[in-house]
């Protein structure tokens, strides 16, 4: 009986012990889960410190120097602008008109023009430029490594530079045609205005182009200490537009037309029969606008008007 009683007591005691263990196991699991959960928790300031350098690095890679003058800022300027102006670090007391003349030469480089002597020295390094384009980044960087060569006359009021237009490798090299690629850039300082004229080289009878610029609008009279030279310049996007629109692009188009090179893709590169098909949709006032573009379009616009008058009379 005693043995049976002890077995019964042991049998009754067993569930009691297992129940306590079952209650302890969930508590241990919860504690383990809590311990495991606390291992991955990070302070917010630590996460931010690891991310900030990455954001700064990504931002710095996106900020690069612009390609052309019109996109220049006080912090970032084109590489060719920096190269050319660094050669004039000791000439900070130059007149503001002369600085504006140098900016004009930078725009000329972007439009496919170069100073003649520089062209002769760097000709073997210059890449061909097609007739329907003008900007070549590699050419501009190479040519900007040389100083701008120009004459200064009449007490620092007149600046004269001889330019040459860049073309592709298939351009003819006859003397008469090469002369058509030469032009003269002259800037005259008149008070606060700089009169800039781009004329074909003699004996050409083709017209020239000119524009008047306000010196103080684009170049400040004061140079800040410990600041780059280009901090004096303002509204370079407007300056670039004025020079390209009124000087360099019209002159380049005129030179290419004189050499009978098609400015494709453009209206000047179409077959002759297509001009009449296009111009017949224009009224008289629109034809007059087209006729003032150049002699080529003037001829076709007048032919369309003549055919209209002839058809109306018949």
From Swiss-Prot:
Region (Required for interaction with skpA and Cul1, but not with PI31): 257-314
Positions of the UniProt region annotated as Disordered: 1-62
TM region positions: none
Expression by tissue: Expressed in testis (at protein level).
Gene Ontology process terms (BP): positive regulation of mitophagy; protein stabilization; protein ubiquitination; SCF-dependent proteasomal ubiquitin-dependent protein catabolic process; sperm individualization
Biased composition (Low complexity): 21-34
Keyword tRNA processing: no
GO molecular function, one term: ubiquitin-like ligase-substrate adaptor activity
CC per GO annotation: cytoplasm; SCF ubiquitin ligase complex
Signal peptide: none
Keywords: Cytoplasm
InterPro entries: F-box-like_dom_sf, F-box_dom
Compartments, record wording: Cytoplasm
Function: Functions together with PI31 to control non-apoptotic caspase activation during sperm individualization. Positively regulates PI31 stability.
Subunit structure and binding partners: Component of an SCF (SKP1-CUL1-F-box protein) E3 ubiquitin-protein ligase complex, at least composed of ntc, skpA and Cul1. Interacts (via F-box domain) with skpA and Cul1. Interacts with Prosalpha7 and PI31. Interacts with Bruce.
Name of the protein described by the UniProt record: Protein nutcracker
UniProt source species: Drosophila melanogaster
